[in-house]
Regions:
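Ribosome-associated RNA-binding proteins
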Residues: 1-191
Length: 191
């Protein structure tokens, strides 16, 4: 079944500007600026006012209409990023060998360096994306805090760190060592 026209209305909060040109979305807010390319999704954008945008799909089937809600969620995540920001907390879990995690900079590129994982001599490195800040927690022992404006960048960095510390060729019920996401949320909860 084809839907003749389906639309969603996205409200824009005060202090945030959204510019859309050729399906390239640019969101500017108090914390900075984010851009997202949506050229691969066939949707139309109409600016109703400075505070609202209408996203429309013409002659779309079920999957095409489902992409409409995805586009709305992606832009809403950009708006949340430039107003409040995203923060992920990760905890080190180890039974015997204490995991040593440092943030190092090499040739202008930052890395998270993981040493002594399961007592291994190998040093594991994860590249930190632009716009993401990584720091060791000052209040909690064995905790890493990732924060930034882009939900995709922060969550992908957290996933990369968790993935590089996967235990292979051993029973994962017994070997629980690793670095895991313990908490995710917003930097400014009240904004």
């Amino acid at each position: 079944m084809k839907y003749i026209q389906t639309d969603q209305i996205l409200d824009i909060p005060a202090g945030v500007t959204v510019n859309i040109k050729a399906r390239s979305v640019k969101v500017t807010g108090p914390r900075g600026e984010l851009t997202k390319e949506l050229k691969h999704i066939d949707v139309a954008f109409t600016k109703i006012s400075d505070r609202a945008i209408k996203i429309t799909v013409h002659n779309g089937d079920r999957k095409h209409v489902a992409a409409l809600r995805t586009v709305k969620s992606l832009i809403a995540n950009l708006i949340t990023g430039v107003t409040k920001g995203y923060k992920y907390k990760m905890r080190y879990v180890y039974a015997h060998f204490p995991i040593n995690v440092n943030v190092v900079e090499t040739d202008g590129q930052k890395f998270v360096e993981i040493r002594n994982f399961l007592g291994e001599k190998r040093v594991r490195q994860v590249k930190i994306f632009d716009g993401v800040t990584v720091e060791n927690s000052t209040t909690q022992k064995d905790e890493l805090i990732l924060s930034g404006n882009s939900l995709e960048a922060v969550s992908q960095n957290a996933a990369d760190i968790q993935q590089i510390c996967r235990v292979r060729n051993k029973d994962i019920r017994k070997f629980l060592d690793g670095i895991y996401v313990s908490e995710r949320g917003l930097i400014n909860e009240d904004a």
